[in-house]
UniProtKB/Swiss-Prot annotation:
<dbReference type="InterPro" id="IPR017896">
    <property type="entry name" value="4Fe4S_Fe-S-bd"/>
</dbReference>
<feature type="binding site">
    <location>
        <position position="105"/>
    </location>
    <ligand>
        <name>[4Fe-4S] cluster 2</name>
    </ligand>
</feature>
<feature type="domain" description="4Fe-4S ferredoxin-type 2">
    <location>
        <begin position="155"/>
        <end position="184"/>
    </location>
</feature>
<feature type="binding site">
    <location>
        <position position="167"/>
    </location>
    <ligand>
        <name>[4Fe-4S] cluster 2</name>
    </ligand>
</feature>
<feature type="binding site">
    <location>
        <position position="164"/>
    </location>
    <ligand>
        <name>[4Fe-4S] cluster 2</name>
    </ligand>
</feature>
<keyword id="KW-0677">Repeat</keyword>
<keyword id="KW-0479">Metal-binding</keyword>
<keyword id="KW-0408">Iron</keyword>
<feature type="binding site">
    <location>
        <position position="98"/>
    </location>
    <ligand>
        <name>[4Fe-4S] cluster 1</name>
    </ligand>
</feature>
<keyword id="KW-0411">Iron-sulfur</keyword>
<dbReference type="InterPro" id="IPR004017">
    <property type="entry name" value="Cys_rich_dom"/>
</dbReference>
<keyword id="KW-0249">Electron transport</keyword>
<keyword id="KW-0813">Transport</keyword>
<dbReference type="GO" id="GO:0046872">
    <property type="term" value="F:metal ion binding"/>
</dbReference>
<dbReference type="InterPro" id="IPR017900">
    <property type="entry name" value="4Fe4S_Fe_S_CS"/>
</dbReference>
<feature type="domain" description="4Fe-4S ferredoxin-type 1">
    <location>
        <begin position="86"/>
        <end position="115"/>
    </location>
</feature>
<keyword id="KW-0472">Membrane</keyword>
């Protein structure tokens, strides 16, 4: 792992508008802030092939080995985007550079670099738009905020467009509703047309295209991980539990982020899923299957390009149709929910098989079990037709009193909740996680209001920023969230921060260690698993002695 900086020094800089028109040069590209460029094995493979991906490039080299006609390719891609994407065209034209977004970006707060203001990040692209696609820019040049493309401008694009986690907090405060994340996404696509792809996200995209998940796990590895989870749960609960993998005719397809199969603390959410699904089958006959083909809920294509996103999320609907399931439950993954909430049904056609259509004509769980009658998923889903988030699903079960809960099993935890950007701002799921947590535990405390729900601060590792070479940027960008966390730790004695996002769970353990905040990191489904009483198996509330981490639930008397 890259070393994190010993001390963060933040110097705020506010140049005039003409100064920022000068692009950076190679000497301005710094370690800790620059993303490595993808290697041919990631972008020139049988499963994921990008233009000019057969060349190895070095972000710290003077020569980035751009194709000879790179400028023509970029401008053609720019023109295509303007013609096909109305929002992108509008966002190019309507910004008045008021600066309302400037101090809303965690990267600008943490770095003090003015080109990390959302307005200026977008201006790196907008200035080129003005020069080539507007009359004012063609006539007045820099006096109209326009500049021509050259290699330094392209390097600046790559450097700063990959210092954005696409969290969209800036768009919340923009009086015109400009979505800078969308500007960045389409500009990254333009860069990919000349061979400039970020290495970290392309490793995951290629692996997912090849194996079905970001980790590159094949069927045996995934199945073995789940079997290990069942073995651990027997030690904790005393019951022989089971699960289904690739089961035709199951009621539900469950899709988790692949980090849940191996990483910590993600693993404890995995155990929570398995407990819930066993209780529901034993009690109500509802069957849930995993898939080794569609074994990844996340989609790093949503950080890269439309085409990459479409390629990866196509697998899930294909598998839902092949297995004949009635609906899909998604696990604790952040960007999965922007993808499934806003993109999947326009990128790929939903399943058309009879079981799916019949269920969604009237999505009442009574179709599966008479004992579940009255739980209409249409009242709980906030995402695309056919999908429900696992926390929305648990909220429905709790509201209708279909599972038994003992919140005292979590009394050794004092929790706060981090809203993942793509779950909160991306799909509007704000209250369901809090409803679940307040039911499964007795000690829950929110962070300050201006740092949560739709105003949540980013973990600073999404959008491809989880790359190890960006460690300094990550530790700077996570500062606002860490300050809010430190507040509730001091005020309420919080000892765990919960988040339903795999990238959060990878970033925050490093961040709390760096910022010296003594808390654990986990997911809401871990707390659900702790509190869930396996009534169908004969378990009583007082029977469970250990939580899913193997920690004693109650102090020895």
């Amino acid at each position: 792992m890259s070393e994190v900086p010993e001390e963060l020094k933040i110097k705020q800089k506010f140049p005039n508008w003409y100064d920022w028109l000068k692009p950076i040069t190679q000497k301005d590209i710094k370690h800790g802030f620059a993303s490595y460029i993808a290697l041919p094995k990631q972008v020139n493979s049988e499963f994921f092939k990008m233009p000019f991906g057969d060349v190895e490039r070095d972000v710290f080299s003077e020569d980035w080995k751009l194709p000879e006609n790179w400028k023509e390719i970029i401008l053609d891609s720019f023109k295509e985007t303007l013609e096909k994407n109305r929002a992108f065209k509008v966002f190019m034209d309507i910004c008045v550079r008021c600066g309302a977004c400037a101090d809303k970006c965690h990267y600008y707060i943490g770095t003090g670099d003015p080109k990390n203001m959302p307005v200026m990040r977008a201006e790196t692209v907008r200035s080129v738009y003005r020069y080539y696609f507007t009359i004012g820019g063609k006539l007045f040049g820099k006096w109209a905020g326009a500049r021509p493309l050259d290699e330094n401008v392209i390097k600046e694009w790559y450097y700063y467009l990959l210092q954005c986690s696409l969290c969209r907090r800036c768009s919340l405060f923009c009086p015109y509703g400009i979505d800078t994340a969308e500007v960045v996404w389409w500009a990254r696509r333009m860069l990919s047309r000349v061979g400039l792809n970020q290495r970290f996200m392309c490793i995951s995209i290629e692996a997912s295209a090849r194996t079905g998940n970001h980790l590159g796990l094949y069927a045996g590895g995934m199945a073995g991980s789940i079997e290990q989870g069942l073995s651990e749960l027997k030690d904790i609960t005393g019951f022989d539990l089971h699960t289904y993998i690739n089961k035709p005719g199951a009621d539900v397809l469950f899709v988790a982020p692949s980090a849940d199969y191996f990483a910590t603390p993600h693993w404890y959410a995995m155990l929570g899923y398995l407990l819930l699904f066993n209780e529901l089958e034993e009690r109500y006959g509802l069957t849930v299957t995993w898939s080794t083909y569609a074994s990844e809920g996340g989609n790093f294509g949503t950080f890269h390009s439309y085409e990459a996103a479409q390629l990866l999320n196509s697998k899930i609907y294909k598998e839902a149709e092949r297995l004949g399931v009635k609906f899909i439950i998604g696990g604790e993954c952040g960007h999965m929910w922007r993808d499934k909430h806003q993109f999947i049904n326009t990128m790929n056609n939903p399943p058309k098989h009879a079981e799916w259509k019949k269920f969604w004509d009237d999505p009442d769980l009574g179709q599966i079990s008479e004992k579940l009658k009255g739980i209409n998923l249409g009242e709980f889903i906030s995402g695309e037709h056919g999908w429900i988030h696992v926390l929305e699903f648990v909220a429905a079960l709790i509201k209708h009193k279909k599972i038994d809960i003992d919140p005292s099993r979590n009394d050794h935890w004092r929790a706060t909740y981090h809203d993942p950007c793509n779950v909160a701002r991306g799909m509007g799921m704000l209250e369901e996680p809090r409803y679940v947590l307040r039911n499964v535990m007795n000690n829950f405390y929110d962070m300050p209001e201006h740092t949560i729900r739709e105003k949540t601060y980013c973990c600073a590792a999404g959008g491809g920023m989880l790359a190890e070479e960006l460690m300094e940027l990550r530790m700077r960008g996570v500062m606002p969230r860490m300050m809010a966390l430190r507040y509730v730790v001091k005020k309420y004695g919080v000892n765990i921060m919960l988040t339903p996002c795999a990238i959060d769970k990878a970033q925050f353990p490093i961040a709390v260690d760096y910022w010296k905040i003594p808390v654990e990191i986990g997911g809401p489904m871990e707390m659900v698993g702790n509190a869930l009483v396996l009534t169908a198996f004969g378990e009583k509330p007082e029977d469970r002695k250990y939580d899913l981490r193997g920690t004693p639930i109650r102090e020895e008397e």
